């Protein structure tokens, strides 16, 4: 039996933003030769690794700010930076973020809050495809509410409405609700640069409507034809790894 296709928030948002980028990222293997290392990805991956270790209740080796800074140094990724100076500036900024976030987490640790998982892969069968999503952290709050925490290393602010309107956060809530059907579920984005958080929760009706929308979008992605992937100029073309590929297509005009 053939495996059911899988779609993730990143795949879905990529297709909605640019079907051509989806093609080169996930469908046509030629695209991988055009991918370049990104400094923001290296920076974010490093911070995620530190917080994964710190919040993993099974990892007793990272419990203090000093431990977290040690893991930061060990985990640092230097790929994608334009110069050594740019990398050093980012390294210093990341170190300050780790100190601030971990200090705050230790000082404000809430009674009754338990981390259930870090870097947890959630799945749900949505009929023609399987929806998957990897959450940075999954907490159980004192009242039994399941909280999904998503770290954002590039944001300088975050609001409740942004969390509510975020496709990935809605996907995570849908997936978490499948795993914990009798629990309330909430989503939180943690903007690491400013150490600020915002949370939102979709109602059962909102989740039902969202699930129907995602199924429809998924069907569109899975049934996409060659013409659907036709490259068309748009603002996000500037700086895209695949611009050279799209320019080779006579339809790109």
PLM features: what roles do these ranges have?
Residues 1-41:
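C-terminal, charged and often intrinsically disordered regions of DNA end-processing helicases
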Residues 117-176:
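Non-catalytic protein-protein interaction segments used by genome-maintenance enzymes to assemble
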Residues 30-38, 57-62, 83, 158-159, ...:
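Short, polar/flexible loop-turn hinges at active-site or ligand-entry regions and domain interfaces
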Residues 6-7, 143, 174-253:
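Metal-dependent nuclease catalytic regions and adjoining charged, substrate-binding loops involved
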Residues 24-31, 48-49, 74, 149-153, ...:
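Short acidic (Asp/Glu) and glycine-rich catalytic loops that position anionic groups and cofactors
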Residues 49-119:
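A non-catalytic, helix-rich entry segment at domain boundaries
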Residues 19-27, 142-150, 215:
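Active-site-adjacent bridging/hinge elements
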Residues 39, 43, 47, 90, ...:
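Hydrophobic (often cysteine-bearing) scaffold residues that line and stabilize catalytic clefts
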